[in-house]
Amino acid sequence: MSFNSKASKYQAENTVDKLFSNILHTTTPKSVSNTNTKTKTKTKTKTKPISSTQLLVNQLQSSNTNSNSNTKRKKHNINKRINKTLLEEKKFSKFIKYNHIKQKSIKSESDEKYLHKLIRKNINSLNKINKIDDLLIDEELNQIKLELLANESNVGNVGIGHFKGGKRLRKKLLNNNKEQEEFDGFGNISNNKGKKNSHPGLTPGLAPVDYEEEEEEE
């Protein structure tokens, strides 16, 4: 078969090779060579050695990122401290301003408002701190408060014995007073019980040797 040119011959050979490859499911030597060249180029691009300068650049970049993160942390900590000191100074200035004793004529309306606000705030904080965790004690205290209020509305004046448990407290106080009357500070009996059947110069309850009860009767 004669061809007009080399290009037409090359094209005809390619078409025939493609037909055979499709029928027989085989690869032509040209296609094999093409695939080999492609893989070679890929391996060349993959196994490209890294220069020492590139390594140094990479190390510097990583160190720069670390230093930047450290500086950011330091700045954040410094700002935090500054804000804390500013708040403390503000609180201290308010404390000096409003705890300074002034006359009512000198105080302005804004001062009075702020003082009332400050008082309420302090009362709330104290109530939170003094809140009793034990429910039983809290209930007992509430009961005593209610009883005191009820007695106050009925009588007007509230004493120790007006609420439950007051009688016991009163008895306890009376017993303590009696004990204090019976003994002086040195452990000796100081009331009339000790003076009965006692004589000067002797221990309480003993009489002198020459003492006779008949003389006492005379």
UniProtKB/Swiss-Prot annotation:
Main function: Involved in ribosome biogenesis, probably through modulation of rDNA transcription.
Keyword entries, A-Z: Nucleus, Transcription, Transcription regulation
Protein name in the entry: Regulator of rDNA transcription 14
Cellular localization per UniProt: Nucleus, Nucleolus
Similarity-based family: Belongs to the RRT14 family.
Keyword NAD on entry: no
GO cellular component, as recorded: nucleolus
Annotated signal sequence range: none
Major localisation: nucleus
Pfam families: RRT14 (PF17075)
InterPro entries, A to Z: Rrt14
Low complexity bias: start-end ranges: 28-38, 59-70
